[in-house]
Each structure stands twice: as structure tokens, then as C-alpha cells.
């Protein structure tokens, strides 16, 4: 008996009137992973496309794999470079991540190979991702069951994005709390996928940032070594300017290429602009992400950073950061490619996408440069622009209506 035949045989038990009717959402989610849904459009508009929403979300999920794999490697590389023999023994005794790595025979030294560093990073990343997926999935299933509709595919992307934009040292209970806020408050309360006006992954991270700032910011959360402090490149530039960009382990200057590749501490999936561009190019080529939004973000960022460069400041080193550094440090790349382009919370109209993207680029640089307390600005910039996306679309639509009326009257 083939899998498709088996699924078709048990389907009646999950349909209305069947003995497992209340579990239809779970059946539908499992069945459509392997086969395209047989549902058809019953009213306008009718769209023919080989790529349904589930496949689209899975492609975005896969596009994040380069950043995910490099992020796991970098977690290990940063930790092993900072470890001393005393710190290693202390960590094995007090941290279950290190105890597990030791039990698996992983060489936890700067001489470790790529695979060893990646496996160590996986010990930090995978529990966070599993926690986020299970807890967030629970809320998705609960709301789908209560509302009697299918489980939405967007959670594939929300879960991995959330896990990639947090520090590797984030406690698992906070990961569960953050994704709960993102899924329930930022999405399901407003009706679920397609009706949320904010990016759920970013909303969950913002909640954790304001509720538990010690675990989402500062110098002690980016390197997976207990008691070790290592500032991000943004924090170093904000404190000492370009001359302050130093590798905390080797003392060598961090070059632009180092930052582009991702040889620096940060959230798991945001460090490598190169890996993010590979995945971003894929979703743009597949026409999943809007190139207009990405271009708008870049234009806004370049314009605002150039303005600050022109103005200059004797007291604020961030005024001097050029646009090409803004691109490769912090969460700019992952935000621009994978969060600003969220089709639900972004603008729908083509003109609106340009304005929406430009607002994100401007606000990101503005927050990074002017905000004295926190050097990163991409998260807040995207959430701020999410609020304005409907306004941009409204004015674009009104302008089109006026233009058509003028044309018909002329």
C-alpha cells in the first residue's frame, strides 16, 4: 500500500462527522507535506501557479540553511577561540552543553575542525530550534483546532527565523516564552497567517528584548562560554569607532571581509552576510521575496548613512560608519532579505514596497546612530515600518483612483 493510498483511506475519519474530526488540522498538515492539497478555488480570484503557499514557505525555510549551518559553525569557532583549559573544565562541570559535547568526544579547542565546531554549535542551536518549533507548533495546532481550519505553513519560517535571531546562550524557557508571544499575540490574536500586521518572529524577539534585556543584549551573551564577554562589532564601533573593531580573542583588527564572511560574535543566523545573500538571492530568483523592498531598504540605508557621514560628529563614532559597514554588521542583512520581505506584514503595492523598504533603511541607521542605549536598529525599524505598510498602500491606491478619475473625466 502506497503512502498516498494510505492517506486517502484514512482521510474520511478526519473529515466532518468522522471519529477523528477534531484532529483534521494535524492530518491535513501531515498529508500536504508529501502531496499537494486537492482543494480548489471556489470563487474569484482564480490563480494558477505550481507553487502553493506550503511549498513557498518550505523554500524560504531551505533558503535559511546556509545561514543556519554557518551560524552553528561560528558558535563553535567563537567559543573554542575563547576557551582556556580552566574555563573548559569549569564549563564541562556547570554547563550541560559542554558536558554533552565532552561526552560525544568533540575536541573543544581552537585546533578543532569545521565539523567539530559545527557539532558544538548544533548543541546550542538545535535545542533552541526544537523548543521554538514544539511550543510554537502547539499554539498553531491549538488555534487551528479551535477555529477548525488547516495549520498554516508560515510557522516553518517563523520558527527558524526566531531561532536564528537570538543569541546562542538564550535560556530555553525564554525561547518558549518569546515564540509564544510572537505566535499568539502578534499573529493568532489578529486571525492567524495572512492577517497579522507585524512579523511574528521579530515581535517575539522584541518582547524578550524589553522583558529580559540582559539575555538579548550586552557583551556576555554572544559567545557560548560562561563568564566570557565579547562585544558585537556594532557595540565596538559605537564605543571606539572604526579603530575599536578588534577580535576580542586574538586582538587583531576585524576587517570588512571578516564581517562579510561572519568571523565575529552575534546572533546565531545573522553573522554571515555572505550566507544570507546566498539564501536571499534564491528567494528573489524564485520570486518569493520582493526585490523592490530589498532595493528600497538599501537605498534608504545608503542615503541615511551618507547623510550622517556628511554631518559628522566629534562625540558619536556611529556618525562615521559608512553604508558598506552597516550592511555587514548586526541584523541588517537577515532583516532586509528575510523579514522586511515578509509578504503579509509588508506593503502590497509596488510603489508602497519602495517606500516601505526605504523607511526600514532610514529607521535602521537612525536608530543605530542616534540611540545611545542600544547600537542595533533593524528589529525596531522593521516593526515600525510594519505599522506604516497599510498606510503606504492606502495612499498609493488613492493616488491611482484619482489618476483614473482624472483620465476618465479628461
UniProtKB/Swiss-Prot annotation:
Reaction catalysis annotation: a ubiquinone + n Na(+)(in) + NADH + H(+) = a ubiquinol + n Na(+)(out) + NAD(+)
GO cellular component annotations of the record: plasma membrane
Residues modified as FMN phosphoryl threonine: 232
Subcellular location: Cell inner membrane
Required co-factors: FMN
Bilayer-crossing regions: 56-76, 119-139, 159-179, 266-286, 293-313, 318-338, 347-367, 377-397
Matching Pfam families: NQR2_RnfD_RnfE
GO term, biological process aspect, one: sodium ion transport
Keywords recorded for this protein, A-Z: Cell inner membrane, Cell membrane, Flavoprotein, FMN, Ion transport, Membrane, NAD, Phosphoprotein, Sodium, Sodium transport, Translocase, Transmembrane, Transmembrane helix, Transport, Ubiquinone
Membrane topology label: Multi-pass membrane protein
The UniProt record lists the keyword Transport: yes
Gene Ontology MF: a single term: oxidoreductase activity, acting on NAD(P)H, quinone or similar compound as acceptor
EC annotation from Swiss-Prot or TrEMBL: 7.2.1.1
Transmembrane helix recorded as keyword: yes
PANTHER family on file: ELECTRON TRANSPORT COMPLEX PROTEIN RNFD, NA(+)-TRANSLOCATING NADH-QUINONE REDUCTASE SUBUNIT B
Subunit comment: Composed of six subunits; NqrA, NqrB, NqrC, NqrD, NqrE and NqrF.
Family: Belongs to the NqrB/RnfD family.
Function: NQR complex catalyzes the reduction of ubiquinone-1 to ubiquinol by two successive reactions, coupled with the transport of Na(+) ions from the cytoplasm to the periplasm. NqrA to NqrE are probably involved in the second step, the conversion of ubisemiquinone to ubiquinol.
Full protein name: Na(+)-translocating NADH-quinone reductase subunit B
Amino acid at each position: 500500500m502506497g503512502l498516498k493510498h494510505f492517506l486517502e483511506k484514512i482521510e474520511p475519519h478526519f473529515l466532518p462527522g468522522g471519529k477523528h474530526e477534531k484532529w483534521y488540522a494535524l492530518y491535513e498538515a501531515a498529508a500536504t507535506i508529501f502531496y499537494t492539497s486537492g482543494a480548489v478555488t471556489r470563487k474569484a480570484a482564480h490563480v494558477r501557479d505550481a507553487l502553493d503557499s506550503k511549498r513557498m514557505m518550505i523554500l524560504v525555510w531551505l533558503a535559511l540553511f546556509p545561514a543556519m549551518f554557518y551560524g552553528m559553525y561560528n558558535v563553535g569557532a567563537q567559543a573554542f577561540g575563547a576557551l582556556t583549559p580552566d574555563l573548559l573544565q569549569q564549563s564541562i562541570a556547570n554547563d550541560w552543553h559542554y558536558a554533552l559535547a565532552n561526552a560525544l568526544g568533540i575536541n573543544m579547542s581552537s585546533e578543532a575542525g569545521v565539523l567539530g565546531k559545527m557539532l558544538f554549535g548544533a548543541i546550542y542551536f538545535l535545542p533552541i530550534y526544537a523548543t521554538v518549533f514544539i511550543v510554537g507548533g502547539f499554539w498553531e495546532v491549538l488555534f487551528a483546532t479551535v477555529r477548525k481550519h488547516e495549520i498554516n505553513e508560515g510557522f516553518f519560517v517563523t520558527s527558524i527565523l526566531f531561532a536564528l535571531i537570538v543569541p546562542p546562550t538564550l535560556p530555553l524557557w525564554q525561547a518558549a516564552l518569546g515564540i509564544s508571544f510572537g505566535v499568539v499575540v502578534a499573529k493568532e490574536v489578529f486571525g492567524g497567517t495572512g492577517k497579522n500586521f507585524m512579523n511574528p518572529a521579530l515581535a517575539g524577539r522584541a518582547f524578550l528584548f524589553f522583558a529580559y534585556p540582559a539575555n538579548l543584549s550586552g557583551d556576555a551573551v554572544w559567545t557560548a562560554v560562561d563568564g566570557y564577554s565579547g562585544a558585537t562589532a556594532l557595540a565596538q564601533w559605537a564605543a571606539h569607532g572604526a579603530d575599536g573593531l578588534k577580535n576580542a580573542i586574538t586582538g587583531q583588527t576585524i576587517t570588512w571581509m571578516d564581517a562579510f564572511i561572519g568571523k565575529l560574535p552575534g546572533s546565531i543566523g545573522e553573522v554571515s552576510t555572505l550566507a544570507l545573500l546566498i539564501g536571499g538571492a534564491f528567494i528573489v530568483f524564485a520570486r518569493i521575496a520582493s526585490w523592490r523592498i530589498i532595493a528600497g531598504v538599501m537605498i534608504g540605508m545608503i542615503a541615511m548613512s551618507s547623510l550622517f557621514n556628511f554631518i559628522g560628529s566629534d562625540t558619536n563614532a556611529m556618525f562615521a560608519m559608512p553604508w558598506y559597514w552597516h550592511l555587514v554588521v548586526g541584523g541588517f542583512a537577515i532583516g532586509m532579505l528575510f523579514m522586511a520581505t515578509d509578504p503579509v506584514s509588508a506593503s502590497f503595492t509596488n510603489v508602497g514596497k519602495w517606500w516601505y523598504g526605504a523607511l526600514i533603511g532610514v529607521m535602521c541607521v537612525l536608530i543605530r546612530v542616534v540611540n545611545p542605549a542600544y547600537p542595533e536598529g533593524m528589529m525596531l525599524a522593521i516593526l515600525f515600518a510594519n505599522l506604516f505598510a497599510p498606510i503606504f498602500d492606502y495612499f498609493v491606491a488613492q493616488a491611482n483612483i484619482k489618476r483614473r478619475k482624472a483620465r476618465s473625466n479628461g
